[in-house]
Amino acid sequence: MILLGSSGSIGKNVAFLAMKYGIKLDALACKTDYKELNSQISKFNPKFVYIEDNKLKNLVEHSRVFTSKDGIDKFLEACYDEFGSTVVINSLVGFSGLRPSLVSQKLGFKLALANKESLVAGGKFLDTKSINPIDSEHFGLKFLLKNRPAVKKMIITASGGAFYDMHINELEFVTAKSALKHPNWSMGAKITIDSATMANKLFEVLEAYHLYGIKDIDAFIERTSCIHALISFMDGSTTAHISRTDMKLAIAHAIGLEEKEILEPIDILSLKNISFNTINLKKYPIFTLKKDVLNNPDLGVIINAANEEMVYKFLNNEISFLDINRAVFKSLDKFGSVKIDDEDTVFEIDKKVREFCKGF
């Protein structure tokens, strides 16, 4: 198995399960955290490792280290030459995860995908039917689809993020520090901000479309985050996927551990305050784009690039929280008519949108 993004939250959970169940990690890749990478090297003895930052190469305790100077394509090609068609877990953060997803499928790897930007920006160029999704909502949908009648509607849930109980007028002045306090999940900084703006849920709607080919997809607020997904079927029945807020379950199913005891089941008697609410579109304006992205999934490239660029500006205290959405809508005004017919155009538009957003 090849693990991309080994030092992140998902990557560490994959490593935990691999260690617990004796699964070999043949190759590891991360961005800059060489200390965590070295720790994983000592535990798993991988054949190849990759660290994005070339300046850190000499700090990695391994004889076969690839960096951005070589390119992650070369790293994956070396892995394929050595291991053949194995599983690639892509848990990289951001748009940088798209190219490894494309390359992995072209080489013939089985793709287990936690990198949502791969689908948001490049879903039309991926074989989505062969992807194992590592995301609580999409894993929940996949689980519910097994041996079921025709689907009428899919529903995913959102916690509402860090600012759900805050008045709209207060959002202009919130800080990155306060935005990172997610009520239920422990996640990386970028996805936690996306949860607070509801960009994460917009992306997950588009991911669900690419994965399952259904446009009748909605999202509702469910504050406990224990109900991850629901499906309404043509026969009038609705099923829900309920589990603890722990990504190990989705990971386990993606790597063949579905028969193992991964999590303690939720105590059903403890579920006393479950309720669903619609998403407040005034408070979360980015979610007004749901119909637009389902009708024109190419818009995902623009929204993702603008959002990603502005989230990091917000985390660096360069802009206000509400500037994230403002930049997304202005980027759509400027680039929204673009047609994307090939992979190269995805990367070209991404670059242009980021340059445009640097002016904010």
Swiss-Prot record:
Pathway: Isoprenoid biosynthesis; isopentenyl diphosphate biosynthesis via DXP pathway; isopentenyl diphosphate from 1-deoxy-D-xylulose 5-phosphate: step 1/6. Its EC number is 1.1.1.267. InterPro entries: DXP_reductoisomerase, DXP_reductoisomerase_C, DXP_reductoisomerase_N, DXPR_C, DXPR_C_sf, NAD(P)-bd_dom_sf. GO terms for biological process: isopentenyl diphosphate biosynthetic process, methylerythritol 4-phosphate pathway involved in terpenoid biosynthetic process. NADPH binds at residues 7-10, 115, 117, 188. Its cofactor is Mg(2+); Mn(2+). 1-deoxy-D-xylulose 5-phosphate binds at residues 116, 136-137, 159, 182, 195, 200-201, 204. Mn(2+) binds at residues 135, 137, 204. GO terms for molecular function: 1-deoxy-D-xylulose-5-phosphate reductoisomerase activity; manganese ion binding; NADPH binding. Keywords: Isoprene biosynthesis, Manganese, Metal-binding, NADP, Oxidoreductase. It catalyses: 2-C-methyl-D-erythritol 4-phosphate + NADP(+) = 1-deoxy-D-xylulose 5-phosphate + NADPH + H(+). Catalyzes the NADPH-dependent rearrangement and reduction of 1-deoxy-D-xylulose-5-phosphate (DXP) to 2-C-methyl-D-erythritol 4-phosphate (MEP). PANTHER family: 1-DEOXY-D-XYLULOSE 5-PHOSPHATE REDUCTOISOMERASE, 1-DEOXY-D-XYLULOSE 5-PHOSPHATE REDUCTOISOMERASE, CHLOROPLASTIC. Belongs to the DXR family. This is 1-deoxy-D-xylulose 5-phosphate reductoisomerase. It comes from Campylobacter fetus subsp. fetus (strain 82-40). The gene is dxr.
